[in-house]
Amino acid sequence: MTDIIEKNAEENNCEVYGVTQKDFQIIKNYGYCIDFSLNNMYYKNDCFTITTGAVYQVQNCSLALTAAEVLKKTGVVKLESNAVHKAVKKVQWHGRMEQIADNIYVDGAHNPEGIEALIC
């Protein structure tokens, strides 16, 4: 998938922004939320908290944060750092490792990578 995106970006003279596992580090997984740090060209070991115990959502959140900074840099949106941190902490992913009762979780894993992350 990455190859296809990079090829299309090159053909259209567009930048590609991504996040790899080396860009973030899980500080603590409490089971119901995760503290992590993000270190890339936009964030310098900034700490965030997401309200899910789904480890794979750390990379998704990191990518969303990076995309927001790209949009900020290009003048598409205005963002304040403290507002971004607060917003991330309030995000809820209904149907993504959502606990609906004691020991009962719902997850709508919708692709092979999501299913792999769910069962591993």
For the regions a language model picked out, list residue spans one by one.
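Extended acidic/charged loop-beta regions that coordinate divalent cations
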Residues: 2-46
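Nucleotide phosphate-binding/pyrophosphate-handling subdomain across enzymes
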Residues: 39-120
